[in-house]
Amino acid sequence: MNRLFGKAKPKAPPPSLTDCIGTVDSRAESIDKKISRLDAELVKYKDQIKKMREGPAKNMVKQKALRVLKQKRMYEQQRDNLAQQSFNMEQANYTIQSLKDTKTTVDAMKLGVKEMKKAYKQVKIDQIEDLQDQLEDMMEDANEIQEALSRSYGTPELDEDDLEAELDALGDELLADEDSSYLDEAASAPAIPEGVPTDTKNKDGVLVDEFGLPQIPAS
């Protein structure tokens, strides 16, 4: 049958609101151009009427101007109607798009809720509490280990009063050690002879030095 009558052509999709808006706007632009041409004719007729005297010729020009003005008013009405149609379709298109966006948002929210429920099923509060307890126990064990490592060995406990008494006594001992006995010893030491020592003799008539020892004669 397809060979005899041919295959039916697929139906074209119906025009969308965006396509209709484009078509209406194009028609409105075409009408605007016509109105502009009519405005130019009206200006020309108006100049002619100003320069002409009253009479049949002037009346004929006026009739032409009135016909052009009437066409202009009709085109303006058509343009206004098309503008209103375009506005209405744009509002409808905006509403449709808003509804589509709303549906997309709702679908995304539903999917999010579904994923959240799925995730919550995988998380159990008992496991979280057990994990917290394990962490707390591990922290306590770590603190005990630190205390054990920092513990001192063989250190007797000392009384604070005994330490203070020892400190006071230590101060007295330091003051006692800082005496001036070494100054007395220095004062009793033999004085350093001043000037050149003179020759002296002992009881046997032998020359002796300043220390009382016999002098060795120079060779």
Curated annotation (Swiss-Prot):
It holds the Pfam family Snf7. One of its GO terms (molecular function) is cadherin binding. It is a peripheral membrane protein. Its main location: cytoplasm. (Microbial infection) Stearoylated By S.flexneri N-epsilon-fatty acyltransferase IcsB, promoting S.flexneri evasion of autophagy. A lipid is attached at K7 ((Microbial infection) N6-stearoyl lysine). GO terms for biological process: autophagosome maturation; autophagy; cellular response to lipopolysaccharide; cellular response to muramyl dipeptide; erythrocyte differentiation; ESCRT III complex disassembly; late endosome to lysosome transport; late endosome to vacuole transport via multivesicular body sorting pathway. Changing K7R: Decreased stearoylation in response to S.flexneri infection. The modification Phosphoserine is found at S86. Residues 121-158 are annotated as: Interaction with VTA1. Keywords: Coiled coil, Cytoplasm, Endosome, Lipoprotein, Membrane, Phosphoprotein, Protein transport, Transport, Ubl conjugation. Induction: Up-regulated by muramyl-dipeptide and lipopolysaccharide. GO terms for cellular component: amphisome membrane; autophagosome membrane; cytosol; ESCRT III complex; extracellular exosome; kinetochore; kinetochore microtubule; lysosomal membrane. PANTHER family: CHARGED MULTIVESICULAR BODY PROTEIN, CHARGED MULTIVESICULAR BODY PROTEIN 5. Probable peripherally associated component of the endosomal sorting required for transport complex III (ESCRT-III) which is involved in multivesicular bodies (MVBs) formation and sorting of endosomal cargo proteins into MVBs. MVBs contain intraluminal vesicles (ILVs) that are generated by invagination and scission from the limiting membrane of the endosome and mostly are delivered to lysosomes enabling degradation of membrane proteins, such as stimulated growth factor receptors, lysosomal enzymes and lipids. Belongs to the SNF7 family. Probable peripherally associated component of the endosomal sorting required for transport complex III (ESCRT-III). ESCRT-III components are thought to multimerize to form a flat lattice on the perimeter membrane of the endosome. Several assembly forms of ESCRT-III may exist that interact and act sequentially. Interacts with VTA1; the interaction involves soluble CHMP5. Interacts with CHMP2A. Interacts with NOD2. Interacts with BROX. This is Charged multivesicular body protein 5.
